[in-house]
Amino acid sequence: MEAIRKQAAKLREQVARQQQAVLKHLGHVNADAVVVDEEELHCHQKLQDLYSSTKAAKRLQRNIVRGLEGFIATGTKVVEIGLKFAEDFKKYGDENPDANTPLSRVAHHFGTSYKSVEGERETLLGVLSEQVCEPIRTMIYSAPLEDARHLVNHYDRLRQEVEAQATDVLRRRSKLKESDISEEAYIKLKNSESRLAELKSSMKTLGKEATKAMLEVDDQQQNVTSQRLRALVEAERSYHRNALDILDKLHSEMIAEEEAIGSSPKSLPLHIEDSASLPQQEPNSNSSGEIKSNPLGKIKASRREEIKSNPQEVTKPSPKDEMKSSPQEETKSNHQKEIKSSPQEEIKKSNGSDDHHNHQLLSQNDSYFLAKVVHPFDAQAPGELSLAVDDYVIVRQVAGTGWSEGEYKGKAGWFPSAYVEKQEKAPASKIVESNSKQQ
């Protein structure tokens, strides 16, 4: 429809120019007597260009608003999913019993970082909605644009009236030329010419007013749309820059955790070492017997229920473990009483080094060894043995269930294997203190 209207306007202008040229050639009228002049044609063309420009800009603004609304709706859903995703990691890192393990720490950092990233995304969506989408939507339906378009439409109607009136003037003048001039015909001609002059004057005034209004609207559309697009880009840059900083920090924390794990001693836990039946090393051996452990290993509740005996006595493993026990484990139980009944005076009188103390206490059974407590353990069931950090315990046997049996401060019982580290040497004071408690 718009194309048809433009084509009709071009045809009218072409006909008007042809009529004006013919009349000039015949000498009936002067250049400004009937049809529009060049200034008016220029104004009309300018209004047509401005109308097309504002219409295209309005279409672009509608596309921007429609696209941003979909982007914000989708982004809001992404934020909800991302926050739930991050919360699951934080929950694992904060509520997991092994809260100090590398995975727990990494999960905590991961959840915290991704929650911050989603917070930045939420900020971005707020900026897009308030600073980009709303101003453009307001301009689409603003009064200045509608008023300017109303003036242009009024100008087009008035221009059509001018063309029609000019045609009427030409018709009357042609009649006066062909026949005798009557007073009535002359009066009608003058009235028609006067009407044409009034319409042309109104058209010029309205054309200037419509051109000014359309220029203001066009400038406003261009400037505001460009500014809002720049605000959109700045918001996107800020979001990606902040998200990148957060992810860089998370990456550094994860690398640090991996390096910390790689730099720690790489040795097997107690129960793995026992099941592998490795030969017992001598106290003076050069190889280290220290065992890498996880001080916050998870304690199975089912194992607590299996331990029935008094904490003062040595708790026996379950019947299933007894069936799997070897003659070597029976030898461990036979030597248990010998260690408990060893006289304290013999250890106190020895004047040798720490190796001599360890050898005197443990030489009765090669399968026994000393272990240093690296994490405290509070006994919560009969048969369990409480431990204190930096003290030493005599380990009698290591079960495949992750628990070990040993003596500590005159008491015997079970404790998690991961809470102690095997030692080749121990301070003499610790051994004397341990033996004195047993006596």
Curated annotation (Swiss-Prot):
Where is it localised? Answer: Cytoplasmic vesicle, Clathrin-coated vesicle; Cell membrane; Golgi apparatus, trans-Golgi network; Endoplasmic reticulum
Instruction: Specify whether Coiled coil is a keyword of the entry.
Output: yes
Tissue specificity here reads: Highly expressed in flowers. Detected in seedlings, roots, leaves and stems.
The SH3 domain is annotated at: 366-425
One Pfam assignment: SH3_9
Q: Which residues form a coiled coil?
A: none
One Gene Ontology term, aspect cellular component: clathrin-coated vesicle
Start and end residues of each stretch annotated as Disordered: 277-362
Q: Which Gene3D superfamilies match?
A: Arfaptin homology (AH) domain/BAR domain (1.20.1270.60), SH3 Domains (2.30.30.40)
List the biased-composition ranges (Polar residues): 277-291
Residues of the BAR domain: 32-263
Record key words, sorted: Cell membrane, Coiled coil, Cytoplasmic vesicle, Endoplasmic reticulum, Golgi apparatus, Membrane, SH3 domain
InterPro entries, A to Z: AH/BAR_dom_sf, Endophilin_SH3RF, SH3-like_dom_sf, SH3_domain
From which domain of life does this come?
Eukaryota
Give me the stretches of Basic and acidic residues compositional bias. 318-358
- Role this protein plays: Lipid binding protein bound strongly to phosphatidic acid, phosphatidylinositol-4-phosphate and phosphatidylinositol-4,5-bisphosphate. Binds actin in vitro. Involved in trafficking and modification of clathrin-coated vesicles.
Q: How does it assemble?
A: Interacts with the auxilin-like protein AUXI1.
Query: Which named protein is this?
Result: SH3 domain-containing protein 1
The source organism is: Arabidopsis thaliana
Q: What is the lineage of its organism?
A: Eukaryota, Viridiplantae, Streptophyta, Embryophyta, Tracheophyta
Gene name as annotated: SH3P1
